[in-house]
Amino acid sequence: AKYLLGLSTVQMNKRHDYDGADAHQFEVLEMLDLVKVKWNDGETKTAPEGLKQLVNPYDEREAVADRARSYLHANCAICHIDAGGGNSQMNLEFTTASDKMKLIDVPPIHHKFGIEDARLIAPGDPDRSVLLHRISIRQRGQMPQLATTLIDKPAVKLFRQWILSLEKPAKK
């Protein structure tokens, strides 16, 4: 495989409260000898605080686009990346530029679920958005596919908001 099913830098890049002791997760992993990077040695080019990081997708104080992109990275990009296990063409990593994601206003190459003029994400039109449909169901075609039996209702609300916030393309 050309990828690893696991956590990524942007997912782990945050401070955490360890029973009253606030510390950066990377520095804790370093102290436990689980990673070999020496963040404070002066040779590492970027300290953890300077690296990109996800936001909490359920924190409504954060920008809706950042929340949606963070959710996609944590729940979908594990397969939907270049050379990933998903056989669609999208790249849902948080660091991928929006115009390179192959997601917005792109027709699905697989199931359309009976949605007329379906798009993976139809800007401004949640009802034509296959991704929203997939996260709204728990049956064949659901996303995420693994380890989930319940619909993530806050995520469905988030993606509806995000899709509505996207500008519809000009009519041709």
Each PLM stretch: what is its role?
Residues A1-K172:
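Sequence context surrounding c-type heme c attachment/ligation sites in exported
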